[in-house]
Amino acid sequence: MKIHAILVVAFLVLMKTAVSQDNNPLEHCRDVFVSFMPCMGFVEGIFQQPSPDCCRGVTHLNNVVKFTSPGSRNRQDSGETERVCLCIEIMGNANHLPFLPAAINNLPLRCSLTLSFPISVDMDCSQFRNTKNPDVEKLN
């Protein structure tokens, strides 16, 4: 548990440093990192259930994507689905922590949520390609 807290603090410090630099792709992921950070203990297998903060964060991301993706009532075609997907992918790749595929796949079910975007270890964010969002281009 203590090592987990140290890793989370280190990740937040790195994120703050990276986010403060101009034109850094991570600045476009800040909201995703903050929303998904409370889920780390669950997806790493430390906790059996996601915390309420984790579920609130995933719900927030789901709402961001839901109201900006093609087919939604408030369609803006802004590329938010791809941005959120890429940010989660970056966080998973950068963390080098042992994410449990089953925990990631069960996150929506455990939070009683139907996601508007995929969360899995095999995410393919290219299926949400949107060239209209300059933030997405900076992440690629």
From Swiss-Prot:
Residues 1-20 form the signal peptide. Tapetum-specific. Also present in pollen. One of its GO terms (molecular function) is lipid transporter activity. One of its GO terms (biological process) is pollen sperm cell differentiation. InterPro entries: Bifun_inhib/LTP/seed_sf (IPR036312), Bifunc_inhib/LTP/seed_store (IPR016140), Plant_nsLTP (IPR000528). It comes from the Eukaryota. One of its GO terms (cellular component) is endoplasmic reticulum lumen. It is found in: Endoplasmic reticulum lumen. Keywords: Disulfide bond, Endoplasmic reticulum, Signal. The keyword Disulfide bond applies. CDD domains: nsLTP1 (cd01960). Disulfide bonds join C29-C87, C39-C54, C55-C111, C85-C125. Belongs to the plant LTP family. This is Protein ARABIDOPSIS THALIANA ANTHER 7. It comes from Arabidopsis thaliana (Mouse-ear cress). The gene is ATA7.
